[in-house]
């Protein structure tokens, strides 16, 4: 299982890697094919199938502890993939286990199996969720490009990995991916090593930093082959430029702050310079992987490794120009790491507060020195400066690492080592490019800028760095000592500071790109020193800072201008100063002035500008907010004298006023008068409301009637209610004939044909009476009801008169429904009794209630028909009249009865049981009144039919 877990984790990490790869879409599909195959197979088994399909584990050679593998006591018979265990508490289909087949032993009574404490789906998704980034192209990439995944090791994987590292946020996976990329780059030369790396990357992704360390070292091994990589560098650089991840740096770490925005636009990756840039960006990527954790910005920065540096983290560096500075720093760090610790580094690191950074920086410094020596463009002083910047960077990195997981540290270290080797190669390439670049326009290539700048900067830096690094060592402000020095140290420092938490844009801005960027750094420093006159540089720096701040806020904008783009990199100390913003920034300026007094004005001024910009880049929003607050306080103090009243007093005053006003209002409150006020409109409103409440069922009708009649008069309301109920009854009758339900009810009722006959006669009478009433009521409420009432009279009359037809439609229907209803009547009976036939029936709001449930109504009708029940309903409803249980009484009084009462006896019914009736209307009426149009009519029909049947 451990193996499977490893493969799982490996595949998972590789999958995420794959996703990043597929996202970044390296151009080379798969360069390391052999590796691709071996790895592909593993991955295919572990990750690919897994990522995508829920195919049974047994089918996959995967050893992942899939919940449905036999291993977890599961019978084959249930099918591997079936959620076999976990049958639930009452295990239906008892998979096995005793008890309730709830299972003992591994089958815990707790429904989950021993291992399957999680359902396979859940378990899978659990194991899978990290792994299965199906949303991320990775899983797809995995399954789609198994080979590609190995080819991931190839260029695609390298750029993808770069992008992976860039989205260091994807951290370990991406880290491993990046390392895989580097290893795959190397792996083109040495696929075996790459394979190990890939495997290790998997394991490492799981193991975290440890694996990354391994990967780093492995990657470092191939890194020396970076020449091959360098050759592919251009494409890689373009890839890295292309790779979305790289472009969208994981804003993972403040390091991104190192955003010396390179002037050269992202396009700068010219094929030739591009390889160095791509190397730089790769280093940046590696560094991103290593230091990218520190600053996701670096990732973005390398992304644009050839492009501008990404703005500081504060400004969304995510898409800032590649953190070439970061990449540079990282590469230098890695180089330094590859080299042993350097005395300079040590010194600087000692000065640096972070201890972790110290060792790394020493290593990086040495590596940088070696690189610089290899480059030859830079003197030892430059090397010192560069390595020192790395040292600060590593210091800053390390604090950041401290915040980050050990994996990141390990990855970073490995990457630094890797990058150190790679950067050495890169530096060699860069030196070549430098010599070219110095001659070539700065815009043509960043390395060219760097060469030019470095040519000048090397001298300046050598001088200033050699002399001033000590001063920088002396003070962290001194770390800013040389602009060039500071540019690079600032890359480190800004990372440091950002890691330290300053995360200031300026720090990030000052950060430079990788070795190319290092050159750029030198170039920028030189530019700032030599190209721009100090004043111009200051202004430019400020402009840049402003623009960088803007860009920082926005996505990275490359300063295409060639102005010195040195953004203030804040040393952690500066950071400390700058965080307090004003004071620290000023202190920083002072320190810088003192430290850089030897420096050229340009550098100093750029630093000064950067200090200012550091303040501004502290975060424009921060500064702005501070500024606003200051203004507000100033204005308040000077222009708005305080009344001397405390907030408590002030609000108490308001509260008192409010209470007094409220009391006054309450005394005079017209609302009360309105309540008391008795006006037709009020009654209309109240009456309608009450009516609706009372008989929402009828309200459809009653409300209409009320509106149509004079809703103002309560008496009218009462009459209207009666009329509406009558109408409802009439409607019910007419609708009974019309309604299939009603007809079915009629049939139910017609089960007792005697009742039918009675009903017919009664209904004729009812209808005639109802007609008169409904006509009167319709005259009162002519609108909807009048036609209905008239309709009813006519239809009812026809039905009543043609009792056979009427009864047939109703009663025939009733006959049919009768049996059904009677079948339902058992229910209906229960219902009615349960429902309280008394209420429901008397009002036929019972029916109405049932009408809300027509089935119930039908049943209730049956019950009502049932002489047994009807008498009861009589008793309940017509407490007096209806107590006569005889059908005769029903016939005679049935009209007065609840159903018919709506017709004629309605008034009597109301009188006899007015409160119950109204209560019904209120209760059941609410449900049913609206239904009353149909169901209400049905109810009335039911009532009528019930009454006749009762009769």
Swiss-Prot record:
Localisation per UniProt entry: Nucleus
Q: InterPro entries recorded for this chain?
A: THRAP3_BCLAF1 (IPR029199)
Entry-linked Pfam families: THRAP3_BCLAF1
Biased composition annotated in UniProt, kind: Basic and acidic residues: 58-75, 144-155, 167-188, 347-387, 411-449, 460-483, 490-518, 537-547, 661-677, 688-758, 877-891
What superkingdom heads the lineage? Eukaryota
The UniProt record lists the keyword ATP-binding: yes
Keyword Acyltransferase listed? The answer is: no
Recorded GO MF terms: ATP binding; DNA binding; transcription coregulator activity
Q: Which residues fall in a compositionally biased region of kind Polar residues?
A: 204-220
- What are the GO cellular component annotations? mediator complex
UniProt feature, compositional bias: Basic residues: 14-51, 121-143, 759-772
Keywords attached to this entry = Activator, ATP-binding, Biological rhythms, Developmental protein, mRNA processing, mRNA splicing, Nucleotide-binding, Nucleus, Receptor, Transcription, Transcription regulation
Name the residue ranges with Acidic residues bias: 926-936
Q: Which residues form the signal peptide?
A: none
Q: Which GO terms describe its biological process?
A: mRNA processing; positive regulation of transcription by RNA polymerase II; rhythmic process; RNA splicing
Ranges annotated as biased composition (Pro residues): 266-276
Annotated residues for binding of ATP: 549-556
Grouped into one coarse class, the protein's main location is nucleus
Q: Where does this protein have compositionally biased stretches of type Low complexity?
A: 1-13, 82-94, 157-166, 305-322, 337-346, 548-558, 776-786, 844-854
Q: How does it assemble?
A: Associated with the large multiprotein complex TRAP (Mediator complex-like).
Could you tell me what this protein does?
Answer: Involved in pre-mRNA splicing. Involved in nuclear mRNA decay. Initially thought to play a role in transcriptional coactivation through its association with the TRAP complex; however, it is not regarded as a stable Mediator complex subunit. May play a role in the positive regulation of the circadian clock.
| UniProt family annotation | Belongs to the BCLAF1/THRAP3 family.
Question: Protein name, please?
Answer: Thyroid hormone receptor-associated protein 3
Q: What is the organism of origin for this protein?
A: Xenopus laevis
């Amino acid at each position: 299982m451990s193996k499977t877990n490893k493969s799982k984790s490996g595949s998972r990490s590789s999958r995420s890697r794959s996703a990043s790869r597929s996202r970044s879409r390296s151009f080379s599909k798969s360069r390391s094919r052999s590796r691709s195959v071996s790895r592909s197979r593993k991955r295919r088994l572990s990750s690919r199938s897994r990522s995508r399909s829920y195919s049974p584990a047994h089918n996959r050679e995967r050893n992942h502890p899939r919940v449905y593998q036999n291993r977890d006591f599961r019978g084959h018979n249930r099918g591997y993939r079936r959620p076999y265990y976990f049958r639930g508490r009452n295990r239906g289909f008892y998979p096995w286990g005793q008890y309730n087949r709830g299972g003992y032993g591994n089958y815990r009574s707790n429904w989950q199996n021993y291992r399957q404490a999680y359902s396979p789906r859940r378990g899978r998704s659990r194991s899978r969720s990290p792994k299965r980034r199906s949303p991320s192209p990775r899983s797809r990439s995995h399954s789609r490009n198994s080979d590609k995944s190995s080819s991931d090791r190839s260029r695609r994987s390298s750029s993808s990995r770069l992008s992976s590292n860039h989205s260091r946020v994807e951290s370990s996976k991406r880290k491993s991916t990046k390392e895989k990329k580097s290893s795959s780059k190397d792996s083109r030369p040495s696929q075996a090593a790459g394979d190990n790396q890939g495997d290790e990357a998997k394991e490492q992704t799981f193991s975290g930093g440890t694996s990354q360390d391994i990967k780093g070292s492995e990657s470092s091994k191939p890194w020396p082959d970076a020449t091959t990589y360098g050759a592919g560098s251009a494409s890689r650089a373009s890839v890295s430029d292309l790779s979305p991840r790289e472009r969208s740096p994981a804003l993972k770490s403040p390091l991104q702050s190192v955003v010396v925005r390179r002037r050269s636009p992202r396009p700068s990756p010219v094929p030739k310079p591009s390889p160095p840039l791509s190397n730089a960006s790769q280093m940046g990527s590696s560094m991103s992987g290593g230091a990218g954790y520190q600053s996701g910005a670096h990732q973005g920065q390398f992304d644009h490794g050839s492009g501008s540096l990404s703005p500081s983290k504060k400004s969304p560096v995510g898409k800032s120009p590649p953190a070439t500075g970061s990449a540079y720093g990282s590469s230098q760090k890695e180089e330094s790491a590859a080299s042993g610790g350097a005395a300079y580094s040590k010194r600087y690191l000692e000065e640096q507060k972070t201890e972790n950074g110290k060792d790394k920086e020493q290593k990086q410094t040495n590596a940088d020195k070696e690189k610089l020596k290899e480059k030859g463009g830079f003197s030892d002083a430059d090397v010192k400066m560069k390595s020192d910047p790395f040292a600060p960077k590593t210091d800053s990195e390390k604090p950041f690492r401290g915040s980050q997981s050990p994996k990141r540290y390990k990855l970073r270290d490995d990457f630094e080592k890797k990058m150190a080797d790679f950067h050495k190669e890169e530096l060699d390439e860069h030196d070549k490019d430098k010599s070219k670049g110095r001659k070539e326009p700065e815009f043509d290539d960043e390395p060219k800028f760097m060469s030019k700048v470095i040519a000048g900067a090397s001298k300046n830096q050598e001088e200033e760095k050699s002399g001033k690094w000590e001063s920088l060592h002396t003070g962290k402000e001194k770390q800013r000592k040389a602009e060039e020095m500071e540019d690079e140290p600032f890359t480190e420092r800004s990372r440091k500071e950002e890691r330290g938490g300053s995360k200031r844009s300026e720090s990030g801005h000052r950060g430079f790109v990788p070795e190319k960027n290092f050159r750029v750094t030198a170039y920028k420093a030189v530019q700032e020193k030599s190209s721009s006159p100090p004043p111009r540089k200051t202004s430019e720096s400020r402009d840049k800072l402003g623009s960088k701040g803007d860009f920082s806020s926005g996505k990275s904008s490359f300063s295409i201008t060639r102005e010195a783009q040195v953004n203030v990199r804040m040393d952690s100390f500066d950071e400390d100063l700058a965080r307090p913003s004003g004071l620290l920034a000023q202190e920083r300026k002072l320190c810088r002035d003192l430290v850089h007094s030897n420096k050229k004005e340009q550098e100093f001024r750029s630093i000064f500008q950067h200090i200012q910009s550091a303040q501004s880049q502290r975060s424009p929003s921060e500064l702005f907010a501070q500024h606003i607050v200051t203004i507000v306080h100033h204005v308040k103090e000077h222009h708005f004298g305080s009344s001397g009243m405390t907030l408590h007093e002030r609000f108490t005053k308001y509260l008192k006023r409010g209470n007094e006003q409220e009391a006054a209002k309450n005394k005079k409150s017209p609302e009360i008068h309105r309540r008391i006020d008795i006006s037709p409109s009020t009654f209309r409103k109240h009456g309608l409301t009450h009516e609706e409440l009372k008989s929402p069922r009828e309200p459809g009708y009653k409300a209409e009637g009320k509106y149509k009649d004079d809703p103002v008069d309560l008496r009218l309301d009462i009459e209207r209610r009666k009329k509406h109920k009558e109408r409802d009854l009439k409607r019910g009758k007419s609708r009974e004939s019309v309604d299939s339900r009603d007809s079915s009810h009629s049939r139910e009722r017609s089960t007792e044909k005697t009742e039918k006959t009675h009903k017919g006669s009664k209904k004729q009478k009812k209808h005639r009476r109802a007609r008169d009433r409904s006509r009167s009521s319709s005259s009162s409420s002519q609108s909807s009801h009048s036609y209905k009432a008239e309709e009813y009279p006519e239809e009812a009359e026809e039905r009543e008169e043609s009792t056979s037809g009427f009864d047939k439609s109703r009663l025939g229907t009733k006959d049919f429904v009768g049996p059904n209803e009677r079948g339902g009547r058992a229910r209906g009976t229960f219902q009615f009794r349960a429902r309280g036939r008394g209420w429901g029936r008397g009002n036929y709001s019972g029916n109405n209630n049932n009408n809300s449930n027509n089935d119930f109504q039908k049943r209730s009708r049956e019950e009502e028909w049932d002489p047994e029940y009807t008498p009861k309903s009589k008793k309940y409803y017509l407490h007096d009249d209806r107590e006569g249980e005889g059908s005769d009484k029903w016939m005679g009084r049935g009209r007065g009865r609840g159903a018919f009462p709506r017709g004629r006896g309605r008034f009597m019914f109301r009188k006899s049981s007015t409160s119950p009736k109204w209560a019904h209307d209120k209760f059941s009426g609410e449900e049913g009144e609206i239904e009353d149009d149909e169901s209400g009519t049905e109810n009335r029909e039911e009532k009528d039919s019930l009454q006749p049947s009762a009769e």
